[in-house]
Amino acid sequence: MAHTNLPEKFQVVIENGENILQRVYNTYKLFQNNKVKPSFFNDEKISKILKNLIAKYPELPENNDKSITGFDLLTSRAKQHLEELEDHYYTITDAYDWKEASFILMQEISSNTVSINFNNNIQLCSKFLDVLVLYGKINYLVSLIPDKKIITAVYAKLFLYTRSASEPTFSKMGRWINDIEQPFKKIQEEFRVLNDAVGHALSSFELTYAKRRVITQLRKDGALNLILKPEDIARPVQDSYRIELAYAGRIQQWILFGYLFAPGTLSTPQSIELLRFTLSECFYLSVFKDISISIHNEFNTLFKNYKSKTINLQKQKKIIKDAAQASTQEAPRKHAERRVYIRQELEAMWNLFRDKPCLLAPKINVLLAALSMAKEEIFWYFRHTDVIPPEKVKKFYNKQNEVREKRISSLLSLVDHLVQLVHTHKKMIQNYYLEYISGADILGLQKVITPQLLQNAGSIVTQAVNTIVNELKSLNANGQDYSFEGFRANWMRLGYLLQSNSCPLKESESKQITSRLNLIYTHSKNVDCLDQLLDEYGNMTQLWSYKEPLFHSFDAAIVDMTCDQPSHSMIYLKLLSQFPNHVANQFYPEEKELIGKECVELANSCLTKITNRIVSIMANTIASTFLSDEQQLADVNAAFPLLQKKKDWKPPKDFVPPIEPASESQFRNRANLEQLRSEEKNAFQLCTALNEFLDITIYDHIFVPREFLREKLGSALKQYMRQSIQPPAPTSSSSQIDINITRLSTYESQLRVFIGVLILVENHVDIDIGDLIRETILTEFYAKALGKSGRVDWFPEGEIEMNELTLHSITSYYVDLVSKKLNTPGVVFSPVKLGFISKAGTPFRAEEHADLTEMRALCDLVGPYGIKVIEREILRFILTTTTSMKEILSLNAANLEEFASNYYKPKAMELLKKFKTTDLDLIVTKSIAIGNALHLRSMIRESMKDVITDNFPYINNAVANAFDQYNRNTFMFPDFLGVDTLALDSGLNVGIADQYLKVILRKVSSEADKRIWELLPVMFSLTFYGNIWKETQYKATIDAHSNNVHVLSKTIIDLLIAFGAINSTTGNEAELFQSFKRFLEISSVNILRMFKGKQGEKFVPNEIQSVIIFLDKFTQQCPLLSKDSLEQYIPYSLIRNMYKDLYEHKNLQKQQSETSEQNF
């Protein structure tokens, strides 16, 4: 054989073989799927024709053979079928041609060499064994193609039909297809001539392979330990030990396929022992991607049926059984131990190289060996996880022997980090070995190559040696991009010559040359093949074939709370970014899109699972614990210990003791605390993982992991805000109890705790949680339908679409509060308490929902925008109620005008009879409702002022100063409306410049209605004759009337000012003063008349003192009246006596003690 063409032949054979292997795999996958293979294969009519066609395969019927009935169904679409089958036919054809060429190459090498030994010539031996393995894989894969006979027969027949000439390769290829029905048996027959060459090559591993697979031996030798000998930390590691470790994965395949194809080499105890050990490591041997073979079944068949004059394998059958048993019972544990060892060493390397990258160059061979071992173990794990062993091995299988690898994620991540680190410092490593070759390696080679050795070598060997030496001497150490392809080709030629039958050198002399050139060969690959080495040892993209177990590992990793696996979860996303570009091949370009789309879906699923896990822990476990701790500070927890000390106190039957503060730290609760810590750790590790990269491109999508988390946290906050505000679900026992939303002060404190939990995420992942919180809260408490700010007519018409916003729940509740709950009998507004209170026994506890504390919480939560929405609903209620009052006024307009003209005359009592008591009471009832709404609005505005003052004091002061620069804009002069609206929105006390109320009441006050609204003071003064005033009582302790009638003062003041300003033609506040004076005058006359009546008469109140006090309170509250305004009609002495009667009268004092503040 001409040694000069050997490198090129190997390169062509191996490259073509790998391409053909991929093409055969594509054909196998396509014809395995009935949905994508050519449609005529599934046609029942044509299937009978196809069976007849291949009945005597590879012999095919002639065209005029009438035995194939219906053959015209195929020929009618001959062109279409030829196009469908052409690629697959020529794939099989190329496989056959490659098989012939590769066998000739191996046979020529075998016949022309004394021995091929890995230790003597790494390059030649590895290439030879790689071709051997490829040979077997291609034969096996072709044998698996389901319809290979039909493909070739139909194509050959249609080729003959269309071109009137036979397809030239069909006859030989057809016989080969028949022969490989049992591919390994055929290969064994063919390889009898290669037994010696294969045996010599595999014998290289007999003494070392088993030792280098035992963990105890590896630890003892410090195989991957870089700091075992600190004094050698900077010295390069380049012995055969590490080099062989780097080839470990390939060596296993060389041994198993080699002994399977060339069983004649199993002639020594050492070879039998090597086979036994290798078989005990696995029960599936990888062929290509997801295809594996049951290696024990194949060897069992071989040992049973192989016949040879030199060896009797039947006597050795027991080793197959022992190895099969070990592969299921012992191998999982051994591989788990190996993974632990490799992971520990990789972690040590990562920490060392990251800190001292200068050590990468001298220790690169150790790193490559570690990466190779890690890759082998990772693929072994996924190939043997959750799979049922083959038939012959299943009987030894016990699922309990399986070892679940909890840290496979960290192993994948460490491999990736180290590969990236080498890429980062690639130039440094290349420089190091380029200088090494041009220096120490050349000197070492020159010492070995003596003149005497060259003289003994002969001219051909000497020429090859000189070529290599001259090339190495011509190296430029500064040329980083130097290619050593020529050197390696020359070394292969020389290695072949040294191993050839005609080589005159002794074996010891040859070893001197090969040992140094093997070393230079290794160094050269570290210069120009570093990327290829990293791809070979660190590329995990073939895990796509095991994507199901791979992503089961991901699912287990993100919920792992025992180690650091969650922090490595992003390695799966990185793999998904690599799959589309590396798994898809040039022979099936459509696959890239299919894989890419699936990777995008998987990436979306992975990020969703990670972020859901984080949010679930934060929003459920941690938040619920923090909220529980917050509840320990509730008032009841302070009262409960005091109640326990009382001897006469007994808890109710259904009483649940409150949580004792600090109880979570008690020893009996340690399990809960440990669980909390574990889940916190899990969530924060996942957050750390999201920080690994800002964004990642997967196929045609760019994923930003942090945005997934940000979106989920925002959704969790929204969900919590919406759910926690809702009232508890009513039960049968609570059906009669009034259901309210959560108290806003409680809700605010709970929300602050929940937000505090979310802020913890900011410590571990680069997300602006503050911005997220502001954005979410603004979204939840802002209605887009609000008009432009700075205008008095901002009220949107109709209903505001708020969907399920938190603001909708709060607004709906306050609408219900204003329209129903505050108007419930037993609920009154207390000026002393600055809020609403409820009488004992009233289901609705107004003091829990309508006091300044709750209003402050409301303003803190919803802000000015939310307050405007609530204020809109309050004003709409006032408008609706005022409209109904207008109807009553219209019906009684004539009587009111007549009474207004004669109220001071004796006939006024006769005129009074024209009014229905129900109308008077209805006016009072509606006015009380309006008063409640106005008081609630005032409380909200006061709270809004406090909130803005606390948060934006300078803005609030600036608005207040601007507002005080002019007199109150009672009549809505346009020049001042801008500042008026700012003052209103800031919560300032605008007094008679309440423009929003005036704007909303304009809708019921047209020019035609002016006369009606002028009668409003008269109507209010007549209401004292109604039944509501008759039954009222003034409660001094709460400064309120028992039936809440005192809120009329707020209603009367605000409505008279508003309608007076709306209907004014002069813009003079004197008009408003006259309106109030008219009310006081008529009311005073009416009340003084009541003094003439007797207790119990129709128009006489039961407690007339309360009516007098009401007028006094009204005068105090009205901004346009003063004390002397009332004294013109009711003497101060009378008012003082009324107060005295209420506060000092014994009977009233007794009654006061019975119906004191505690009843409200």
Swiss-Prot record:
InterPro entries per the UniProt record, alphabetical? Nck-associated_protein-1 (IPR019137)
Q: What happens when the gene is disrupted?
A: Cells have defects in motility, and various developmental defects, notably in aggregation and adhesion.
UniProt keyword terms in alphabetical order: Cell adhesion
Keyword Transcription attached? no
An example of a Gene Ontology BP annotation on this entry?
cortical actin cytoskeleton organization
Describe its partners and assembly state. Part of a Scar/WAVE complex containing brk1, scrA, abiA, pirA and napA.
Q: Which PANTHER family match?
A: MEMBRANE-ASSOCIATED PROTEIN HEM (PTHR12093:SF10), NCK-ASSOCIATED PROTEIN 1 (PTHR12093)
Instruction: Give the protein's function.
Output: Involved in regulation of actin and microtubule organization. Involved in cell adhesion.
Q: What is this protein called?
A: Nck-associated protein 1 homolog
